[in-house]
Amino acid sequence: MAQGTIRFWAAAKAAAGVAEEPYEAETLAAALEAVRTRHPGDLVRVLQRSSFLIDGDPVGTRGHETVRLAEGGTVEVLPPFAGG
């Protein structure tokens, strides 16, 4: 099982109450399920609207269960940003 870091930005950071936390998961889907378990409530809603970067690469429309996580990797949680 891969271990790495999940970073929360903007509304995701506010909802999680932390800027980052470790993950231990093989896929993005498994990592996000663990996050939902640790942070029920507002963060669950924020995750539904968020986009994700894996080691700097956008996940886009790929199924989260198909996105493999690397040892020492980073998942960035990017909620929609307001403004312009």
Please place each PLM-identified region on the residue numbering.
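Ubiquitin-like/PB1-type beta-grasp interaction modules and other compact soluble beta-rich domains
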Residues: 1-83
